Amino acid sequence: MTGKTRIWFNRGFSLAPIAGLMRAADHTLDVFVSVSHQSAHYNGPTETWIDGGDLEPDDKDGYLQWVREMIAVHEIDIFIPTRRRALVASASLPCRVHLPASIPTLEILDDKFLFAAEFAGEEHHLPTHLAQGSDDLERLLDGWPTSEGEPGPCVKPRNGVNGLGFWRLMDVSPLAHLQDSERRRIRPEQYLSAVRGQELRGPIDDIVVMPYLPGPEISFDILATHVKMLKYAARTKLGTGRQHIVSRHPLEDLVASIVAKFSLHGVVNAHFRRAEDGRCMLLEINARPAGGVVYADQV
């Protein structure tokens, strides 16, 4: 035994630098992070390893056995899962398991359509529509407002993280999505054609469609204990690539109410973006630390 408290986060690439901050702040901690096969491994002081080892992705029993082995080998005291949470919560493990919310709540937070529905009728609610296939998507796009000043549509996977699968549907060059893919712009008929093509190969994941928000983004890094927000930092992402970070923000009361609504616990992140009319619309709650929390710590 090392005499230190040993904490393990699973499958969180951005958590490795966060873990380094934790160790620097408290020398009684050892922090480990398991990452995906595609992620880079960090050289100490935080140890990283492949999450799940060589197991097949759908081997649930094998994954739990691997987790038990890692807990034993590394003498883990606290396991903080950021993936496969329902599976982990259902198992009996030889250490403490920390979750940022109940499993039913996490299922809502991970579902962009259900999450948006939780705030229907409220000022910061972002209207979010569900497309379960190309026919749904075509109907939504055909009925989308086209008058001047109306925001165009954007699409995302119903369940997804890190902005994967986000596209703005716009009247752009047919090559725009190939020549400048980082701007995430594609013609609506090209996106719809791609969805139809994918359907010929098999079932597709649900898509959500919502108005595009010009921004800027405002990201709240939150420390909470169940229903109470203890501390936060708000990061406004500027167009220059820099961030403006404050510890007091006009949205503070709203964010505190969201923490209470979902009984959030630990370090989580609330993500807003400004609409054309200046309102801050709630995009999502990430029930895990955001990578940008390291910037807030520096100030």
Predicted segments, located by residue:
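Phosphate-binding site of ATP-dependent enzymes
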Residues: 179-258, 262-263, 273-281
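Glycine-rich phosphate/pyrophosphate-binding beta-alpha loops
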Residues: 163, 236-243, 286-298
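Active-site nucleotide/adenylate-binding loops and adjacent lid/helix of ATP-dependent enzymes
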Residues: 106-206
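Catalytic phosphate/metal-binding cores of nucleic-acid and nucleotide-processing enzymes, i.e., regions
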Residues: 270
